[in-house]
Amino acid sequence: MNRSHRHGAGSGCLGTMEVKSKFGAEFRRFSLERSKPGKFEEFYGLLQHVHKIPNVDVLVGYADIHGDLLPINNDDNYHKAVSTANPLLRIFIQKKEEADYSAFGTDTLIKKKNVLTNVLRPDNHRKKPHIVISMPQDFRPVSSIIDVDILPETHRRVRLYKYGTEKPLGFYIRDGSSVRVTPHGLEKVPGIFISRLVPGGLAQSTGLLAVNDEVLEVNGIEVSGKSLDQVTDMMIANSRNLIITVRPANQRNNVVRNSRTSGSSGQSTDNSLLGYPQQIEPSFEPEDEDSEEDDIIIEDNGVPQQIPKAVPNTESLESLTQIELSFESGQNGFIPSNEVSLAAIASSSNTEFETHAPDQKLLEEDGTIITL
């Protein structure tokens, strides 16, 4: 009677598959429908639920019919494991931080281990675990030039990483104007420029940005038509992984692409930037000369600071003006006005605006200083 009952139950469960999972010294058994095993993510969640480890990252492996321990990490090898299970699917679970990756491979389950040798062998003579090179984790990303294959040679897209470092981004930006050659003639358009680099900052240490580089995009968003404050907010919001597209002031150091197979960040295609004319005519108006009084300073110590302004004599002031004019006339044409410091942009987006007294000469049209 009992035997016939078992036979009947077995014939009625031909569509089910028994699963035996092992996590540490703990074993669990459950059943799945062989015809509808579901997806790997569902199976992964089921294993976590059965073993009561919902917040633990694990590696899942299974024993195939040849005695090999093979990984299960996607839908394809999960369905392969289900199809080869006859009649039992044996699952082995390891914590990721304690996983032995050398256990995966051919004949890994049928090899006999000499337990006595392992017990008697001193710890200093034990075999060290293999170095994992197939599943790297926590690589430190570095700043780099990206999207060389889709940008014009006159443009440069720079990715600045603050990952794992407390270095500030370390550059100042300002608004100004440049004169571009268009089919309709010379056209004066507003723009955002890098005015200064902070020694020891991320921008200077990487060497990817320079003074007077014109900022065209911030993380795939064009800065054309945006104010200096808006561009500053965009950079602050993306300071941990800042991607800036610039037109370098020194075009001789541009990266010349010789292949269409170089890496791409997938951030955005530059159909709009392809329309930018490559030749820029210098234009500088003395009455719009850059003034330290119009600087906006971003600091990370919570104390607003005003850039000190030296008062030279008339003779040295005239010579300094001539030097600035001769230097800036060889770069992209611009007419500087206001300036924002990104010397110490932090990851926090909490921004305080403090209004200064009327006797303080700082950004007269706004009367504010940005403090991080």
UniProtKB/Swiss-Prot annotation:
The modification Phosphoserine is found at S11. GO terms for biological process: axonogenesis; cell division; cell-cell junction assembly; centrosome cycle; establishment or maintenance of cell polarity; establishment or maintenance of epithelial cell apical/basal polarity; protein-containing complex assembly; regulation of cell migration. Residues 157-250 form the PDZ domain. One of its GO terms (cellular component) is apical plasma membrane. Residues 133-150 form the Pseudo-CRIB domain. InterPro entries: PAR6_homolog, PB1-like, PB1_dom, PB1_Par6, PDZ, PDZ_sf. Residues 253-272 have a biased composition (Polar residues). Keywords: Cell cycle, Cell division, Cell junction, Cell membrane, Cytoplasm, Membrane, Phosphoprotein, Tight junction. Residues 253-292 are annotated as: Disordered. Its main location: cytoplasm. Residues 16-96 form the PB1 domain. It is found in: Cytoplasm; Cell membrane; Cell junction, Tight junction. It holds the Pfam family PDZ. Residues 126-253 are annotated as: Interaction with PARD3 and CDC42. Expressed in pancreas and in both adult and fetal kidney. Weakly expressed in placenta and lung. Not expressed in other tissues. Belongs to the PAR6 family. PANTHER family: PAR-6-RELATED, PARTITIONING DEFECTIVE 6 HOMOLOG BETA. This is Partitioning defective 6 homolog beta. It comes from Homo sapiens (Human).
